[in-house]
Amino acid sequence: VTIAIVHLGAGNTASVQFALERLGAHAVVTSDAAVIADAERLVLPGVGAAGYAMTRMAELGLTDIIKGFDRPLIGLCLGQQLLFERSQENGGATMLGFIPGEVRHLDTRPDLPVPHMGWTRLEKLKDDPILDGVAEGAYAYFVHSFVCPDTTATLACADYGTEVPAMVRSGNRWGCQFHPERSAEAGARILHNFLSLPA
């Protein structure tokens, strides 16, 4: 299985590649439109700002290719946020629009720092192949200052003084707000499940 990890000039691409290769996948970090279009799976990692990511995607000629990609796709951290319509970040950014709603700044209790950084339990809300074998209450590693809206796409949430949609799905597109490549056994299981999805 050939996995294309989309490189937008920032992000945790090397650690994602290493995590996938440990599971036996052939993973390439690329911004080449032809490689991305032909991949059997697509990973959209990201750290940083939504507006910058979408601008780079457009500059590289990848926006329409990613929007039209019909095989399994997973967005990680910022990559999950990019699956939604809009973000408040950078004064407002238009995103891929697979899932309705606006990504907003994380508004939590005064005693909880933002960004949300560290290990937080996952609560599964729906059964989904991506969550097969992931224990209820498993810990995942989060680093984020913005949060996706809670929609019918939410598969799992985390409690950080407010409910954080931790995993989402729309058709053949999944998202993790956390970093599965840094989330020990639960993260490895989620990536294994992603590799095992039917194309």
Feature map (PLM): residue ranges:
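Extreme N-terminal starter segment of soluble prokaryotic enzymes
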Residues: V1-A4
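Short acidic/histidine-rich motifs immediately flanking catalytic phosphotransfer sites
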Residues: I36-G46
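Structural alpha-helical scaffold elements that stabilize or flank donor/cofactor-binding regions
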Residues: V35-I36, I65, M167
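Short acidic low-complexity segments
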Residues: A27-D38
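Amide-donor transfer/coupling interface in amidating biosynthetic enzymes
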Residues: E102-A199
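Cysteine-nucleophile active-site neighborhood
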Residues: G48-M117
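Conserved Rossmann-like nucleotide-cofactor binding loop
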Residues: G11
